[in-house]
UniProtKB/Swiss-Prot annotation:
Pathway: Cofactor biosynthesis; iron-sulfur cluster biosynthesis. GO terms for cellular component: cytoplasm. The modification N6-(pyridoxal phosphate)lysine is found at residue 226. Its EC number is 2.8.1.7, 4.4.1.16. This is Cysteine desulfurase. One of its GO terms (biological process) is cysteine metabolic process. It catalyses: (sulfur carrier)-H + L-cysteine = (sulfur carrier)-SH + L-alanine; L-selenocysteine + AH2 = hydrogenselenide + L-alanine + A + H(+). Homodimer. Interacts with SufE and the SufBCD complex composed of SufB, SufC and SufD. The interaction with SufE is required to mediate the direct transfer of the sulfur atom from the S-sulfanylcysteine. Belongs to the class-V pyridoxal-phosphate-dependent aminotransferase family. Csd subfamily. Cysteine desulfurases mobilize the sulfur from L-cysteine to yield L-alanine, an essential step in sulfur metabolism for biosynthesis of a variety of sulfur-containing biomolecules. Component of the suf operon, which is activated and required under specific conditions such as oxidative stress and iron limitation. Acts as a potent selenocysteine lyase in vitro, that mobilizes selenium from L-selenocysteine. Selenocysteine lyase activity is however unsure in vivo. Keywords: Cytoplasm, Lyase, Pyridoxal phosphate, Transferase. It comes from Salmonella choleraesuis (strain SC-B67).
Length: 406
């Protein structure tokens, strides 16, 4: 069955607009995806007709808002096949989720002389929190190097593990290269050494089904805004037994059981003890609508369509004169490139003149830029609403830029 891309595009109002007098070709979904009417309407309806502060309210609006929020927790748990909804913490996004793990689990479990393993392709959100933790604790940060094609040098991984390895923190899919890492093999190796595993799923959950039980990871984190949902909301999954042992990392309302000026404070049970303060309830409602939306289309069908479009894009871009493509042939979501010796910002600015939106810069992956020896790259990302015609416009735009700039 053909993927209904035109029907999907009709659900995204922003795709009807023009930029510089030309139809918008939005090729920046890896930074943040656009939102369908279903998400916009769900969040708007909540604020129009159902808004109230959640927790402890005895009135109808508060009770209904609380129920709606907890229903999204259950929905998200089914989406990633968690064993229980109580294994999911609402966070602002992937970055906060990783920082929560570093500051809660990490503070309790990392000691001087321990080590944490990451890779050279990580987003800063999966580098900096571990650097900060290691510096604070006197631990070591070890790095899996890359092959030139943008895949991990897995032959070096076993040697990085030892009896002081406490955590493997790895991206599911690179936000620059599109590399999908072989998580089952990597997690199995971590298990041999008794290490925990955190997976940054920010660039994975919108492209194919994720099953955290099958992966057997300890932590999995993703953001709503890359999944066609609102900004400011994400999900941190933690295995229940592990989550119950973790102390809170932020204090305030909603995360307590009792507070006494003389006897101290006791915490709420997990996951609520990790959700201090008033939550982003509207964002949570929007996230639920986004999960509904992609589920109704079928992640398998979305993935098949995106892979077909990716193959076409790689074939066509390879024909652009003087282009350098980064990353493996088999990839998800993104294509990073440079055009001759022209700076990525210049190329991106020209493309914007043609109504084409791409991301330029270091993509919050400065160590990866250093490995490739470039200050920046252009990145085109492909989502379920992109088309062959938009790829053709990108190719034509780059060819024109090459002719203009030489």
């Amino acid at each position: 069955m053909t993927f209904p891309v035109e029907k999907v595009r009709a659900d995204f109002p922003i795709l009807q607009r023009e930029v510089n007098g030309l139809p918008l070709a939005y090729l920046d979904s890896a930074a943040s995806a656009q939102k369908p009417n279903q998400v916009i309407d769900a969040e708007s309806a909540f604020y129009r007709h159902g808004y109230a502060a959640v927790h402890r309210g005895i009135h109808t609006l508060s009770a209904q808002a609380t129920e709606s929020m907890e229903n999204v927790r259950k929905q998200a748990s089914r989406f990633i096949n968690a064993r229980s909804a109580e294994e999911l913490v609402f966070v602002r996004g992937t970055t906060e989720g990783i920082n929560l793990v570093a500051n809660s689990w990490g503070t309790e479990n990392i000691r001087a002389g321990d080590n944490i393993i990451i890779s050279e392709m990580e987003h800063h959100a999966n580098i900096v929190p571990w650097q900060m933790l290691c510096e604070r604790k006197g631990a070591e940060l070890r790095v899996i190097p890359l092959h030139p094609d943008g895949t991990l040098r897995l032959e070096t991984l076993a040697a990085l593990f030892d009896d002081r390895t406490r955590l493997l923190a790895i991206t599911h899919v690179s936000n620059v290269l599109g590399t999908e890492n072989p998580l089952p093999d990597m997690i199995a190796l971590a298990r041999q050494h008794g290490a925990k595993v955190l997976v940054d799923g920010a660039q994975a959950v919108m492209h194919h089904v994720v099953d955290v039980q099958a992966l057997d990871c300890d932590f999995y984190v993703f953001s709503g805004h890359k999944l066609y949902g609102p900004t400011g909301i994400g999900i941190l999954y933690v295995k229940e037994a592990l989550l119950q042992e973790m102390p809170p990392w932020e204090g305030g309302g909603s995360m307590i059981s009792t507070v006494s000026l003389t006897q101290g404070t006791t915490w709420a049970k997990a996951p609520w003890r990790f959700e201090a303060g008033t939550p982003n309830t509207g964002g949570i409602i929007g996230l639920g609508a986004a999960i509904d939306y992609v589920t109704s289309l079928g992640l398998d069908k979305i993935g098949d369509y995106e892979q077909m479009l990716m193959r076409y894009a790689l074939e066509q871009l390879a024909q652009v004169p003087d282009i350098t493509l980064y990353g493996p042939a088999q990839r998800l979501g993104v294509i990073a490139f440079n055009l001759g010796k022209h700076h990525a910002y210049d190329v991106g600015s020209f493309l914007d003149n043609y109504g084409i939106a791409v991301r330029t810069g270091h993509h919050c992956a400065m160590p990866l830029m250093a490995w490739y020896g470039v200050p920046a790259m252009c990145r085109a990302s492909l989502a379920m609403y992109n088309t062959h015609e938009e790829v053709d416009r990108l190719v034509a735009g780059l060819t024109r830029i090459h002719r203009l700039l030489g």
